[in-house]
């Protein structure tokens, strides 16, 4: 009987230790995530759909995580390029940008926030930043509440889109109710 009690106690303690260890695993690092496009699920702008990224593509000497979405009627195909080079991580949050291209001439840039849960990434929200801009830096400036600063260049009033973006801008967004809200 004494051996049975000891065995039951060992099983209970072992289960508790296992449960505690699995609950407190550290988030996956950006270095690991940069090589695992399938971990990234992204909400496709202007739709209710989301896609998993599927491959890594070299653009302008840097790796981008890539995925494609086709509308149900097959009329439009959107390609998403997630910029892992500018991704920043603070605890369970990751902020980065991605670019969408489709059959039109625009190249649309979004700021995106992900949250890690048990080594899975959830795309909390995306916000449109601009068309054919140049994102220079993304930084998490506060963790509670989450605040993200984005520095980029956009086109001036008289600058054609065929020329490089030339007007510097900075914006700070706060995550409120899983939405990015512009602060300044």
For the regions a protein language model found, what residue spans apply to each?
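Beta-propeller blade termini
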Residues: 77-89, 137-146
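Short, solvent-exposed loop/turn segments at conserved positions within beta-propeller repeat blades
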Residues: 56-59, 104-108, 161-168
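Short glycine/acidic-enriched loop and turn motifs that connect beta-strands
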Residues: 100-104, 155-158
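Terminal domain-start segments
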Residues: 2-87, 177, 183-184
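Short, surface-exposed beta-strand/strand-loop-strand elements in extracellular ectodomains
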Residues: 109-117
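Short aromatic loop motif centered on NTY/YTY
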Residues: 120-175, 181-184
């Amino acid at each position: 009987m004494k051996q049975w009690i000891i065995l039951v106690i060992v099983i209970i303690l072992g289960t508790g230790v296992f449960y505690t260890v699995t609950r407190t695993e550290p988030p996956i690092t950006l270095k690991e995530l940069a090589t695992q496009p399938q971990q990234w699920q992204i909400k496709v702008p202007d739709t209710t759909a989301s896609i998993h990224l599927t491959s890594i593509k070299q653009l302008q000497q840097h790796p981008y995580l890539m995925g494609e979405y086709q509308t149900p009627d097959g009329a439009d195909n959107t390609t998403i390029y997630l910029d892992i080079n500018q991704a920043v991580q603070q605890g369970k949050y990751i902020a980065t940008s991605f670019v969408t291209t489709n059959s039109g001439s625009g190249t649309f840039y979004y700021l995106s926030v992900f949250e890690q849960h048990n080594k899975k990434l959830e795309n909390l929200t995306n916000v449109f930043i601009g068309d054919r801009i140049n994102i220079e830096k993304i930084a998490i400036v506060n963790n509670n509440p989450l605040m993200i600063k984005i520095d980029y260049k956009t086109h001036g009033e008289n600058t054609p889109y065929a020329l490089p973006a030339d007007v510097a801008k900075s914006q700070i967004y706060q995550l409120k109710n899983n939405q990015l809200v512009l602060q300044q």
